[in-house]
A protein has these predicted regions:
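Hydrophobic/aromatic-rich core segments of domains that either
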Residues: 35, 67-150
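Secondary-structure boundary elements
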Residues: 1-63, 71, 136, 147-167
Length: 170
């Protein structure tokens, strides 16, 4: 339940978490917290930067999947509920739109349970997990240090396809 600079809950986040959480109905109230968070912080590409904290994004009342996940983690940790950051991909029929995605997992009923705040869903049958960690920096796809002058560029390409059992058996 360690907080990081990106997932530290400030007063407004703690108040928000406590408003929607009921210990006697943990799973139901976490589902409600997820839905209310998305209403409070609509998906808004470009609203934040990767270094923005949960508190920064929550104060702006908008963000992307990384921000939704950081705020949800901050809420869970403020409530003393173990939670972790997950990064990966989500399958989409639109092959042109393949981008990293983030969601949370909460230790609930003796196992890690998913919460995709951006899509307001617990069914992750189209998600591909790449990494887990305390926050984005713990689970980001590329991270490093470079010494020296000159410019640099990093180009990546990802493809997420639906897996067919029938194709696997042939």
């Amino acid at each position: 339940m360690r907080c990081t600079p990106l997932t530290r809950a400030d007063g407004p986040i703690r108040e928000f978490a406590q408003r929607w959480y009921q210990p006697e109905a943990q799973e139901a109230s976490l589902n409600r917290l997820m839905a209310e968070l998305l209403l409070r912080m609509p998906y808004s590409p470009g609203a934040t930067q990767v270094q923005d904290s949960a508190a920064d994004a929550f104060a702006r009342s908008k963000g992307v999947c990384q921000d939704h996940t950081h705020v949800f983690l901050a809420c869970c940790r403020a409530l003393a509920i173990p939670a972790r950051y997950v990064s990966g991909y989500v399958y989409s029929d639109n092959a042109e739109h393949v981008a990293m995605h983030a969601w949370a997992e909460v230790w609930l009923n003796d196992r890690w349970q998913p919460f995709d705040i951006t899509n307001n869903t617990r069914r992750l049958n189209q998600h591909l997990r790449l990494a887990t960690g305390l926050d984005y920096l713990d689970a980001c796809p590329v991270r490093g240090t470079r010494l020296g002058g000159g410019g640099e560029i990093l180009l990546t390409n990802a493809e997420v396809r639906e897996h067919s059992q029938q194709a696997q058996q042939q």
